[in-house]
Amino acid sequence: MGRGKIEIKRIENTTNRQVTFCKRRNGLLKKAYELSVLCDAEVALIVFSSRGRVYEYSNNNIKSTIDRYKKASSDSTNGGSTMEINAQYYQQESAKLRQQIQMLQNSNRHLMGDSLASLTVKELKQLENRLERGITRIRSKKHELLLAEIEYLQKREIELENESVYLRTKIAEVERLQQANMVSTHEFNAIQALVSLNFFQPNMIEGGSAGYPLPDKKVLHLG
């Protein structure tokens, strides 16, 4: 059968209260000592009796232990304040980022021609100027790319013309050699076929017009 639960309340009888205090105090001091020895803990115990007498135990200097406790309590309080300040800072930064995202989304919709009802005449004029500057930059870039493409095609045209002249010269040389009976008819036909093959293969436009021969002279104009 287990022990009954003892009700904890103030002992009214003065003598009994003093006797109980002495017993419990000694037991508490013993437990503090055992805790410090068994667990290598720094323990400080201070007890004031109802009459104002002080009893203490410390396995170290009790003042040093109290100072250490004060420092630990101060660090804990400051740490809590720092965490609170950091939390407020991150909340503010998060709110700023959400506001910036909203502004960018609104600006993007305005550039697409949406959600214009809320804009004033001044804001619409500013939006118009932004779009015009953007179109100007786009046209400038397109013009730059077109000029580069035209320059490439002109260089390619010159290369093909030079190659055409070279191949025609080769054909004329082969014909002359045949007339001089230095090349047989079979060899002449083979050389002419090879030259013709080499002539027509490079004489093609590479950029999306494959299969069509490049004219002898191309005049390119910018619109």
Curated annotation (Swiss-Prot):
Alphabetical keyword list: Developmental protein, DNA-binding, Nucleus, Transcription, Transcription regulation
Record localization: Nucleus
SUPFAM superfamilies per the UniProt record, alphabetical: SRF-like
Keyword Amino-acid biosynthesis: no
GO cellular component labels: nucleus
GO molecular function: DNA-binding transcription factor activity; protein dimerization activity; RNA polymerase II transcription regulatory region sequence-specific DNA binding
Start and end residues of each MADS-box domain: 1-61
Domain of life the protein comes from: Eukaryota
GO BP, sorted A to Z: positive regulation of transcription by RNA polymerase II; seed development
Primary localisation category: nucleus
Chain ranges of the K-box domain: 87-177
SMART domains reported for this sequence: MADS
Coiled coil ranges: none
Function per UniProt: Probable transcription factor involved in seed development.
UniProt name for this protein: Agamous-like MADS-box protein AGL11
Organism listed in the record: Vitis vinifera (Grape)
Gene name of this polypeptide: AGL11
